[in-house]
Amino acid sequence: MNNSKSDFTQGSILGKLIPFMMPILGALILQAAYGAVDLLVVGRFGTTEGLSAVSTGSQVLNLVTFVVTQFAMGVTVLIARYIGEKRPEQIGALIGGAIVVFAMISVVLFVVMIVLSRQIAVIMQAPKEAVGLTSVYVKICGSGIFFIVAYNLLSAIFRGLGDSKSPLIFVAVACVINIVGDLVLVAGFNMNASGAAIATVAAQAVSVIFALVLLFKRKLPFKITKKDFSINRHCRRALKVGLPLALQEFLTQVSFLALCAFVNRLGLQASSGYGVACKIVNFAMLIPSSLMQSMASFVSQNVGAGNEKRAKKAMFTGIGVGLVIGCIAFLLIIFKGDILTGIFTTDAAVVQKGYDYLKGFALETIVTAILFSMIGYFNGHDKTIWVMAQGLIQTLLVRLPLAYYMSIQPDASLTKIGFAAPAATIFGILLNVVYLIFLKYKKRI
């Protein structure tokens, strides 16, 4: 690992932030492609019921993945903090404790997804024609949850060390395996949604093995001993940072699952169209998401080094970068959204339903650039309780109520339901601006 490249406390902010962010963005793009391939192949070679099953089931898998990623953010932030404070010897105990905690989380998720797979499909209000396939998809993915959790923990460790390239390699390996698996199992053996789920699990397993081999071969600035594998004080400190983020992400993703349930009530075509639109949405959110993840490490290092002015400047730099790209994404979705949805399915009705949702959602690509850069800044300061609180307020006061209200109107449409997302984000920006002013007034940042 090149120390000068992973030292964010000096040099050009843009010159350090962009090179660190790009591999994170690349990994997120491949992760989105990873999920999109399932829909693309099932949409082309499977059935409409299979497409709906993958759409609904992947929402559940996204919830698990995003929550684990945010939980692991505590590990990323604390590793970066120790590096900024020039105390890398503390990292071994942190990672050992994190392995214990994430192993326990994996066991719980495994049991829930295997035993309650059908109940999950019903709660998601999967169309009755697709309940069985959705249940199978969730169960198969649940069987491989250990690999999904392990991948996210390993990626968090590398990002905390200032290395964002290795996670890109991990997910690239998984993406290739998943594409091959989908083509063989779905297109070749006509296994529909089940084939897509098996390919997903196999790809994650290979990726984790590759990541472990890479980790053991490299020279690290710390050692991990047997006594480190316990819930120690370093681990508890990381949990204090990561737990609020995980809870906030869980409730946010639950709100999107509720949104999926609202849409499923509008019929099979709306369900499939929404699922296709969500894959495009995932791609559109990659820039702000990569900014948020990189911002946390960048800010945390500078906080550890006592350089608050540079940390705040990094936030505004991230906002500027995100806004430029967000505007481009907005125009692409508004004017070419039907072409984008048409990539995933040949069903004209499903294409139109997906485009309808994107029209309402489009503004989110712009406003999220602001919100996520601010959240990354607060995460880097360990202000994760606030990040959780503002997320809950957005979800409970704006996103869910507005989406539900739009879904029960006589003229309910996916466009109106889609607008709930940017409306909640705009409200969140206002909350965060007020909080930032409050902290400045109190001289706490």
Where are these regions (language model features)?
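Short alpha-helical transmembrane segments in multi-pass integral membrane proteins
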Residues: M1-M21, I79-F146, G188-L243, V299-E364, ...
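N-terminal transmembrane alpha-helices
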Residues: F8-L40, R44-F45, Q59-M73, L78, ...
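Interfacial/gating helices of multi-pass transporter permease domains
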Residues: P19, V42-N62, L94, E129-L133, ...
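Transmembrane helical elements of multi-pass membrane transporters/channels
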Residues: P19-D38, I140, A174, A203-S207, ...
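Helix-terminus/linker motif at the lipid-water interface of multi-pass membrane proteins
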Residues: I29, A33-S52, A121-K128, V184-M191, ...
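Small-residue-rich hydrophobic transmembrane alpha-helices
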Residues: L51-V111, I148-P167, G273-L331, F335-G337, ...
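Hydrophobic transmembrane alpha-helices of multi-pass small-molecule transporters
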Residues: L63-F66, N178-D182, S207-L212, F283-L286, ...
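Short runs within selected transmembrane alpha-helices of multi-pass transporters and secretion channels
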Residues: A72, C141-R159, P167-C175, A196-I209, ...
